[in-house]
Design a protein with these regions (language model features):
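Sec/Tat signal peptide C-region and signal peptidase I cleavage site
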Residues: 16-22
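Bacterial N-terminal signal peptides
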Residues: 4-15
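Transmembrane beta-barrel domains of Gram-negative outer membranes and organellar outer membranes
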Residues: 24-282
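Acidic, Pro/Ser/Gly/Ala-rich intrinsically disordered segments
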Residues: 2, 22-25
Length: 282
């Protein structure tokens, strides 16, 4: 599962933001999201990956038996910090992603290590109620070893299309990256990920979700197409902060390559904080 250092780091980040927000608003507690259009906007806003709020995600993929490692466990934690910015007259969304892997090994039990640090900057546009974004992506070789990352610098592009409806959200997030420099013995190749985003809202902040990430890696010859079906719950504080808890089992309808999971459990907590800029509806 997630390392204690990761949990401590995220709790510290959330506590710092909450402390600053509480001084402004008196520290009122979180409340259930109600019903109606306002509640729909709150639930959609909590699930929209480019909603212009400071966002901290603590997420985890639990893989009971990765392909090629029968009877062993793979586990990947993800720390994501996302910040909306306005520079050069453009609405942008910067996201930093740090994986913490607990990976099955051939030598015995699982090892834990940090993966490659990824940063991307999406420039966002609005068209007929749909948010469209695209921008550069770069990944630094911060991984502990080849079991956790490529050992090379990677660059590419990221893009998103997402649209809210009265019933929920529909969209897709795409990343494409290529290795270009670093450890000469490291893998050279390309990885493309496609993440369909489907959410269906109920009353009081409850919702259904499907957000499995499809992965295509040319070096490891990995192809993995999971379909997820999960549930989540959103709370809104009176100061505008959003808290989102969710769990989503995912089953791979197609898979090939080492470490490609047959099924996995994705779970997480997302915290969103207004940052003093005008909130645009997506």
């Amino acid at each position: 599962m997630l390392s204690k250092h990761t949990i401590i780091l995220v709790v510290g980040l959330v506590s710092l933001v909450e402390s600053a927000r509480s001084q402004e608003t008196g520290g009122r507690p979180a409340q259930n999201v109600g019903s109606g259009s306002g509640a729909t906007n709150d639930t959609n806003g909590a699930n929209n990956p480019v909603n212009p709020m400071l966002t901290i995600d603590l997420q985890n993929y639990f893989v009971p038996s990765p392909e090629g490692y029968s009877g062993r466990i793979g586990d990947q934690g993800l720390l994501r910090v996302s910040v909306p910015i306005d520079e050069f007259g453009l609405h942008q969304f910067v996201r930093v992603i740090l994986p913490i892997d607990r990976t099955a090994t051939e030598q015995g039990g699982p090892n834990t290590g940090v993966g490659d640090l990824t940063v991307y900057d999406l420039v966002l546009f609005q068209a007929h109620g749909t948010t469209i974004g695209a921008g550069p992506l770069i990944a630094a070789p911060t991984a502990r070893g080849f079991a956790y990352g490529s050992g090379k610098w990677q660059a590419g592009a990221a893009g998103i299309v997402i649209k809210p409806f009265d019933w929920g959200l529909l969209g897709v997030l795409v990343n494409d990256e290529h290795t270009f420099s670093g450890n000469n013995s490291g893998p050279v190749g390309q990885e493309t990920t496609v993440q369909p985003i489907i959410h269906y809202n109920f009353h009081h902040g409850f919702y259904l979700r499907s957000t499995g990430v499809w992965t295509f890696n040319s070096y490891y010859h990995v192809q993995d197409i999971p379909l997820g079906f999960g549930v989540g719950k959103v709370w809104k504080r009176s100061n505008g902060d959003l808290v989102n808890l969710y769990i989503e089992p995912q089953y791979s309808v197609y898979r090939s390559g080492v470490l490609s999971p047959k099924w996995q459990i994705f779970a997480g907590a997302t915290f969103k904080f207004p940052v003093g800029r005008r909130r645009t509806e997506h």
